[in-house]
Amino acid sequence: MPQLNPIPWVFLFFLVWLVLGFLGLQKFTSVVTTTLDDSSEEVEVKSKEYSWPW
């Protein structure tokens, strides 16, 4: 049985994880930006609604 060269497999392994991580990060950042936009609007409303607790 011939021994396979591990270098291309390691490269492909990291390439696949890099692509998956990039796509996950892109999805995560899009979710975070939408939640940050929503929360920033809520914070503005809350700051007008409530005074400082102390």
Curated annotation (Swiss-Prot):
Its main location: mitochondrion. GO terms for biological process: proton motive force-driven ATP synthesis. It is found in: Mitochondrion membrane. It is a single-pass membrane protein. InterPro entries: ATP8_metazoa, ATPase_protein_8. One of its GO terms (molecular function) is proton transmembrane transporter activity. Keywords: ATP synthesis, CF(0), Hydrogen ion transport, Ion transport, Membrane, Mitochondrion, Transmembrane, Transmembrane helix, Transport. It comes from the Eukaryota. Pfam families: ATP-synt_8. GO terms for cellular component: mitochondrial membrane; proton-transporting ATP synthase complex. The chain crosses the membrane at residues 9-25. Subunit 8, of the mitochondrial membrane ATP synthase complex (F(1)F(0) ATP synthase or Complex V) that produces ATP from ADP in the presence of a proton gradient across the membrane which is generated by electron transport complexes of the respiratory chain. ATP synthase complex consist of a soluble F(1) head domain - the catalytic core - and a membrane F(1) domain - the membrane proton channel. These two domains are linked by a central stalk rotating inside the F(1) region and a stationary peripheral stalk. Component of the ATP synthase complex composed at least of ATP5F1A/subunit alpha, ATP5F1B/subunit beta, ATP5MC1/subunit c (homooctomer), MT-ATP6/subunit a, MT-ATP8/subunit 8, ATP5ME/subunit e, ATP5MF/subunit f, ATP5MG/subunit g, ATP5MK/subunit k, ATP5MJ/subunit j, ATP5F1C/subunit gamma, ATP5F1D/subunit delta, ATP5F1E/subunit epsilon, ATP5PF/subunit F6, ATP5PB/subunit b, ATP5PD/subunit d, ATP5PO/subunit OSCP. Belongs to the ATPase protein 8 family. This is ATP synthase F(0) complex subunit 8. It comes from Branchiostoma lanceolatum. The lineage of its organism: Eukaryota, Metazoa, Chordata, Cephalochordata, Leptocardii.
